[in-house]
Curated annotation (Swiss-Prot):
GO biological process: serine transport; threonine transport
Location in the cell: Cell inner membrane
GO molecular function terms attached to this record: neutral L-amino acid:sodium symporter activity
PROSITE patterns linked: NA_DICARBOXYL_SYMP_1
Gene Ontology CC entries for this record: plasma membrane
Name of the molecule in the record: Serine/threonine transporter SstT
Amino acid sequence: MATQRASGLLQRLAQGSLVKQILVGLVLGILLAWISKPAAEAVGLLGTLFVGALKAVAPVLVLMLVMASIANHQHGQKTNIRPILFLYLLGTFSAALAAVVFSFAFPSTLHLSSSAQDIVPPSGIVEVLRGLLMSMVSNPIDALLNANYIGILVWAVGLGFALRHGNETTKNLVNDMSNAVTFMVKLVIRFAPIGIFGLVSSTLATTGFSTLWGYAHLLVVLIGCMLLVALVVNPLLVFWKIRRNPYPLVFACLRESGVYAFFTRSSAANIPVNMALCEKLNLDRDTYSVSIPLGATINMAGAAITITVLTLAAVHTLGVPVDLPTALLLSVVASLCACGASGVAGGSLLLIPLACNMFGIPNDIAMQVVAVGFIIGVLQDSCETALNSSTDVLFTAAACQAEDERLANNALRS
């Protein structure tokens, strides 16, 4: 009986809500740091192990996901997807730009176990570009060992295009390997509550409860930027497309897609909800049946915001100077990173080291930033997914309605 009860408890823990478990880990970590500082410092090992597991799996994850995605790409998508695809990419880049502006206006400070003396910052945009180019020609094994994400991306894209000409058995093998790595990532992330318990306990024990205010400020910047994009930037893009008041459509998408996505925390899981909303809005089925799954893959405004804000928070904490051209380049890199963040729990967080590489921030410190992202992830990930998923429907509806009006006007003229 005792064994059955224990196995039942483990099953509930494994299949339970990760959000609730992370909340419990946060609360327990705060309580332990308040009750016993030595005990809180001791359980910091749990957080160290969690961050180490993330560092181990992240480079392989990026390589396999990108390679499998390109190798298994299907040709022959309809040409009327192009306006929606353009909106997706423009929206993601606009979100990254907004995040840069927010981060400079309201700089956040993180508590990292390193000082600016450990960092050799680039002197300007030329050195940043030189570093990026040199990273691109890195040996693939060396790139994986040293977490050189630029080099990993280049090899993943190159191998992906090469494997397009391979037979189906090879493509299936690559896809299966990608699924296996994704499973390992999900397994690691199931330990997030325990890791966060250790991280919060040790952080509060060593730095004090003032750290919570630093995370609160970071959350306000992140969520404030996402609200700016959802309520100002996206409506402007929709108005540019449909030339009328965009807010009825914006609020409908936030209400009927964003709310669901906030709680599911998965763009993929929200695809049926978005499909039903598109049908309710009388959109073209041939269009939204392609654009909604496509949006769940590449339309990642929330991820671009997360990557940009957390990267610039690390840069500000370490005292690394950032000029305007470098900030603009970060917006481009964050947009590209965001497009690769789909389908993985915590995907946007695991791509932060790629953006941090631009500023000479080592992988060890970048993964501490990822750990901070997991601590605030209860709200950050929910808001990010709500923005991402609701924008899928919003831009699809805007493009479809603009096309319908164009056809109607042409019919009237003729």
